[in-house]
Amino acid sequence: MIKIFIGHYINVFYSTADITLKKQPLLFLAKLMVYSAALTFFTANFHCNMTRKINEYA
């Protein structure tokens, strides 16, 4: 599920980046920053939930 979710974000990012990359590089960097922040948030959230589940059974 995580791979599908990450793959979706990468595909959306590349489809929008192809159009705007040539004309507006700052917009490209802003979108890159937003998507990387979202990916970091979801990864940290997944890691936190996984750690909590492990600690419940320890």
Curated annotation (Swiss-Prot):
Pfam families according to UniProt: YecU
Induction of the gene: Expressed in both exponential and stationary phase; expression is higher in exponential phase (at protein level).
Domain of life: Bacteria
Protein's name according to its UniProt entry: Protein YecU
Species whose genome carries this gene: Escherichia coli (strain K12)
Gene giving rise to this polypeptide: yecU
